[in-house]
Each structure stands twice: as C-alpha cells, then as structure tokens.
C-alpha cells in the first residue's frame, strides 16, 4: 500500500511510521521540516506547507490511504489568543489542504484517517458518552468540530473518512507522562485538583 502520513515526527506518527514500515507499505511522510539525510527504504519525506502547492500534492494522487495526524501540541504552550490560532490553523487549515489535494487527484485514496480528540465533547462529568453524543461549546470542542468538518469534506470525492477522537495518549517517557512523572520521582507529586475529575486516556500501543 502507498500511505501518505502527516504528523510523522510527532509521538504517535513516529511510532506509526516504524510499524507501517515493517509491513509491505510505501510511506510518503509530509512535514513542515523534513529531517535531513533520512533516506530509509520505503520512506519518502516531502516538505509540506498547507496552502502552498508542491510535490506533496502529487504524492496524494494514487495513494491508497491518507493518515492525518498533524497538529500543534495542545499542552505545549499557554493558550494565548495567538497560540489558539496556531492550534486551530495547524489542524483545520492542514486538513483543508489535504482535502483540496484529494479533490485534485486523478486517482483518489480509498481512505482518510484524520485525528480529532475527546475534547470534542466538552466537560460532562460522570455522563457516559459515545460517538453520537453532541459536541461541547468550549474552545477545544469548537476546534474539534471544525477539524472534523474539514475531514468529512473528503467524503464528497468518494473517500471513506475515519475520525480518531483520542484521549490523552500515554507512553513511557513521552507525551503527558513526560511532564507528569518527574514531580513524583522527587516525592513532590500529588493529585491534580480534587483528584476525582475524569481524564480519558489511551496508551500509545493502542
């Protein structure tokens, strides 16, 4: 299979790249800053700037699947107005650019897997939720709604769209745990808030 992947340098994308490479897959990895000198077999790195035409658009033509994991880290910086715009544009504009490239492709991918998050639902306390539950109305919820809306537009071109509403992704020494574990190692850790609030999570292996 020929798979086009965005977000390949992120925590999820880097692991997925390694696992897909072990199968008989040809990978095209899109990045704003492709690593220099990375010429591993079955992998092709291409510079990707949403809204700017380039070789990356032609790579989508004839691909079997597009996996869209790109997005500025949610917890990387304080949510100033500027940072919120970066969070939004890295997700919504990036997805819009991919769908635009799919629309132009002569041979369109059969599948597009696009990231989202459980932030889609907003805070609900103890209420059980599923994929049919209504979205929330805070910043993260509105961001996820707009993000998913752009991905769904690929369906107009006969592409099956799957959305991944993941929780906090946990992995040893990476992501959220990388920031949460050190205080406990220094015996200064403790519960966050009341310690009774819900925190949906998923392990990186899953």
Q: Model-derived features: where do they sit?
A:
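N-terminal Rossmann-fold cofactor-binding loop
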Residues: 30-34, 49-50
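N-terminal Rossmann NAD(P)H-binding glycine-rich loop of SDR-like oxidoreductase domains
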Residues: 3-23
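NAD(P)H-binding glycine-rich loop region in Rossmannoid oxidoreductase-like domains
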Residues: 43-94
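SDR active-site strand-loop-helix element
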Residues: 6, 30, 69-70, 112-118, ...
């Amino acid at each position: 299979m020929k798979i086009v992947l965005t977000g390949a340098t992120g925590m999820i994308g880097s692991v997925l790249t390694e696992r897909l490479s072990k199968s008989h897959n040809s990978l095209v990895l899109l990045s704003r800053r492709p690593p220099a000198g990375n010429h591993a077999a079955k992998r092709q790195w291409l510079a990707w700037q949403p809204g700017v035409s380039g070789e990356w658009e032609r790579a989508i033509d004839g691909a079997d699947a597009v996996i869209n994991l790109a997005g500025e880290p949610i917890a990387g910086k304080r949510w100033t107005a500027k940072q919120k715009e970066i969070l939004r544009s890295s997700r919504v504009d990036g997805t819009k650019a991919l769908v635009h490239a799919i629309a132009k492709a002569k041979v369109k991918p059969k599948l597009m897997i696009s990231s989202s998050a459980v932030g889609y639902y907003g805070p609900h306390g103890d209420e059980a939720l599923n994929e049919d539950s209504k979205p929330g109305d805070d910043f993260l919820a509105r961001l996820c709604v707009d993000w998913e809306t752009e991905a769904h537009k690929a369906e107009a071109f006969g592409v099956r769209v799957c959305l991944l509403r993941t929780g906090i992704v946990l992995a040893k020494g990476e992501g959220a745990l990388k920031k949460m574990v050190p205080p406990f190692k220094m015996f200064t850790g403790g519960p966050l808030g009341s310690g009774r609030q819900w925190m949906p999570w998923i392990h990186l292996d899953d």
